[in-house]
Amino acid sequence: MTVMEFFALSAGEWMCQRTSHHLAFRRSEGGRSRMQIATLSPADPAVIQVCELFKVDPRRAVGAARVQWNGEQEWDNEEYKGDVVLVPIPDPDNPMRGQLLRDQGYAEKVPVAGTYVMGSDGALTLYTEYEMTESEERIWFASPNLRLRASTVKRFGGFSMASFCSEVRKLSASPSPISAVAESRSL
């Protein structure tokens, strides 16, 4: 599976439940969010803008994913919103890995270029180094409508946070055959 095939399988609305362990504080917290994922074509203005931000030829981009989220964490009960464009630039010698350009980072809210690897098991692993932190995030499908995500963030050479997230795809509200039969009998 290519990174764009992974993004295409991820397209849609997701309900997310996250548990984060803040190792320095010896504390864990839960969080919930809604996430919307859409694929973007290589010619999309957002893709071109991110490529230009990193001085990468936009013709090297194979597309992108736009991820938008809205959620809250138990620790501070603040609402978290965000919107990020992820632009993969495959390695010409091995398209299963490459650069991942982001207009906003995960651990630090700045534009960042990291790397990605598509595993033979279909999992996407993202590696990102920031000025003060580095993160590793692995995302995989347990089923077509269930994604799992595990991540670690290191600060100053030591682990500072580990997270696990389950993401369930929100399906359309079409009536099931059983409820349709029950509804027709009540008429």
Swiss-Prot record:
Its EC number is 4.-.-.-. Transmembrane segments: none annotated. The keyword Lyase applies. InterPro entries: Calycin (IPR012674), CpcS/CpeS (IPR018536). GO terms for molecular function: lyase activity. Gene3D superfamilies: 2.40.128.20. Covalently attaches a chromophore to Cys residue(s) of phycobiliproteins. This is Chromophore lyase CpcS/CpeS 2. It comes from Synechococcus sp. (strain JA-3-3Ab).
